[in-house]
């Protein structure tokens, strides 16, 4: 069983190139890839995820998902999820999404007294926070959360 959680926050002219390959060769293997993040300014991100079910990977499961929040119209997000399969009895899922902040969500948070900038920070942090909370070491989780807050 392999689970990969990847979070990113890109700003200015940062570029992220995320490439993942999960090869399933044994019976009842499991993999799960989650990438999520936010881009602002002119940041760019590309995600290439491949789930490869080889012969012999009977009853295996694999999933990959990429979610990107586009904070500016000048950012670029490319997602290329790929499923390869040489075995019959497997379950493979892939998904990719990119979009702007939901204006209703933004309005709701702002109606509670937060500025637009603060509301956007809350939304971005709430998106990244579940990955941070799964780290399992409180000291590292606090450092990661501080880094996220400094970045946004």
Per-segment meaning from a language model:
Residues 1-114, 135, 140-152:
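Conserved beta-strand/loop scaffold segments within soluble protein domains that form the structured core
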Residues 106-114, 118-130:
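Extended amphipathic alpha-helical segments enriched in small hydrophobics
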């Amino acid at each position: 069983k392999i689970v990969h959680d990847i979070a990113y926050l890109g700003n200015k002219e940062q570029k992220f190139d995320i490439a993942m390959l999960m090869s399933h060769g044994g019976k009842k293997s499991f993999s799960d890839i989650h990438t999520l993040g936010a881009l602002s300014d002119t940041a760019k991100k590309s995600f290439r995820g491949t789930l490869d079910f080889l012969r012999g990977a009977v009853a295996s499961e694999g999933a990959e998902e990429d979610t990107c929040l586009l904070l500016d119209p000048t950012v670029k997000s490319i997602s290329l999820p790929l499923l390869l399969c040489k075995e019959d009895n497997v379950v493979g899922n892939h998904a990719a999404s990119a979009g702007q902040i939901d204006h209703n969500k933004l309005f709701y948070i702002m109606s509670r007294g937060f500025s637009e900038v603060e509301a956007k920070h809350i939304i971005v942090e709430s998106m990244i926070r579940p990955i941070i909370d799964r780290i399992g070491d409180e000291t590292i989780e606090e450092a990661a959360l501080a880094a996220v807050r400094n970045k946004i």
